[in-house]
Amino acid sequence: MPSKSLVMEYLAHPSTLGLAVGVACGMCLGWSLRVCFGMLPKSKTSKTHTDTESEASILGDSGEYKMILVVRNDLKMGKGKVAAQCSHAAVSAYKQIQRRNPEMLKQWEYCGQPKVVVKAPDEETLIALLAHAKMLGLTVSLIQDAGRTQIAPGSQTVLGIGPGPADLIDKVTGHLKLY
């Protein structure tokens, strides 16, 4: 068995101390990130059982979030116009979710902020999708054009749905084709 002084000399060596400090810092950083990004196991959070149940029923089971932008195809907007209208819808949806549900916004951002653009054949379809999304409690943003360039003033151009649970949004827009 090594002598007590040899063990103490080994423990006092600078590289051993550096290793111990590095491991401790890594553990603290990992714990801080888990707390900051809400990645603690459910049993360690302060939510009650009923809060967790209602959240699961609202958010769905997949744990994935996305935003869908539905573009009216009958207006025959140019690519730049579509990009501008989709941007308006995305910013509007972001502002709403930031105010109403910052925790869901954080989850959507953690998922990489996925956005998908799909097309709807006409205004009636857009309005029906709006009603369905509202019924499911999803965030919606309907954009009306000012009419300064390509299309008539007040035309409803793009519907933003989400950010929200992907499986819930798919119930509204899953049948639509990509733009």
UniProtKB/Swiss-Prot annotation:
<keyword id="KW-0496">Mitochondrion</keyword>
<keyword id="KW-0225">Disease variant</keyword>
<dbReference type="GO" id="GO:0005829">
    <property type="term" value="C:cytosol"/>
</dbReference>
<dbReference type="InterPro" id="IPR023476">
    <property type="entry name" value="Pep_tRNA_hydro_II_dom_sf"/>
</dbReference>
<dbReference type="GO" id="GO:0010629">
    <property type="term" value="P:negative regulation of gene expression"/>
</dbReference>
<feature type="cross-link" description="Glycyl lysine isopeptide (Lys-Gly) (interchain with G-Cter in ubiquitin)">
    <location>
        <position position="76"/>
    </location>
</feature>
<keyword id="KW-0053">Apoptosis</keyword>
<comment type="function">
    <text>Peptidyl-tRNA hydrolase which releases tRNAs from the ribosome during protein synthesis. Promotes caspase-independent apoptosis by regulating the function of two transcriptional regulators, AES and TLE1.</text>
</comment>
<dbReference type="Pfam" id="PF01981">
    <property type="entry name" value="PTH2"/>
</dbReference>
<feature type="transmembrane region" description="Helical">
    <location>
        <begin position="15"/>
        <end position="37"/>
    </location>
</feature>
<dbReference type="GO" id="GO:0004045">
    <property type="term" value="F:peptidyl-tRNA hydrolase activity"/>
</dbReference>
<feature type="cross-link" description="Glycyl lysine isopeptide (Lys-Gly) (interchain with G-Cter in ubiquitin)">
    <location>
        <position position="106"/>
    </location>
</feature>
<feature type="cross-link" description="Glycyl lysine isopeptide (Lys-Gly) (interchain with G-Cter in ubiquitin)">
    <location>
        <position position="115"/>
    </location>
</feature>
<dbReference type="GO" id="GO:0016020">
    <property type="term" value="C:membrane"/>
</dbReference>
<dbReference type="GO" id="GO:0006915">
    <property type="term" value="P:apoptotic process"/>
</dbReference>
<keyword id="KW-0472">Membrane</keyword>
<dbReference type="GO" id="GO:0005741">
    <property type="term" value="C:mitochondrial outer membrane"/>
</dbReference>
<keyword id="KW-0378">Hydrolase</keyword>
<dbReference type="GO" id="GO:2000210">
    <property type="term" value="P:positive regulation of anoikis"/>
</dbReference>
<comment type="subunit">
    <text>Monomer.</text>
</comment>
<keyword id="KW-1000">Mitochondrion outer membrane</keyword>
<comment type="similarity">
    <text>Belongs to the PTH2 family.</text>
</comment>
<dbReference type="GO" id="GO:0005739">
    <property type="term" value="C:mitochondrion"/>
</dbReference>
<dbReference type="InterPro" id="IPR002833">
    <property type="entry name" value="PTH2"/>
</dbReference>
<keyword id="KW-0832">Ubl conjugation</keyword>
<feature type="cross-link" description="Glycyl lysine isopeptide (Lys-Gly) (interchain with G-Cter in ubiquitin)">
    <location>
        <position position="177"/>
    </location>
</feature>
<feature type="cross-link" description="Glycyl lysine isopeptide (Lys-Gly) (interchain with G-Cter in ubiquitin)">
    <location>
        <position position="81"/>
    </location>
</feature>
<feature type="cross-link" description="Glycyl lysine isopeptide (Lys-Gly) (interchain with G-Cter in ubiquitin)">
    <location>
        <position position="95"/>
    </location>
</feature>
<feature type="cross-link" description="Glycyl lysine isopeptide (Lys-Gly) (interchain with G-Cter in ubiquitin)">
    <location>
        <position position="171"/>
    </location>
</feature>
<protein>
    <recommendedName>
        <fullName>Peptidyl-tRNA hydrolase 2, mitochondrial</fullName>
        <ecNumber>3.1.1.29</ecNumber>
    </recommendedName>
</protein>
<keyword id="KW-1133">Transmembrane helix</keyword>
<dbReference type="GO" id="GO:2000811">
    <property type="term" value="P:negative regulation of anoikis"/>
</dbReference>
<keyword id="KW-0812">Transmembrane</keyword>
<feature type="cross-link" description="Glycyl lysine isopeptide (Lys-Gly) (interchain with G-Cter in ubiquitin)">
    <location>
        <position position="47"/>
    </location>
</feature>
<keyword id="KW-1017">Isopeptide bond</keyword>
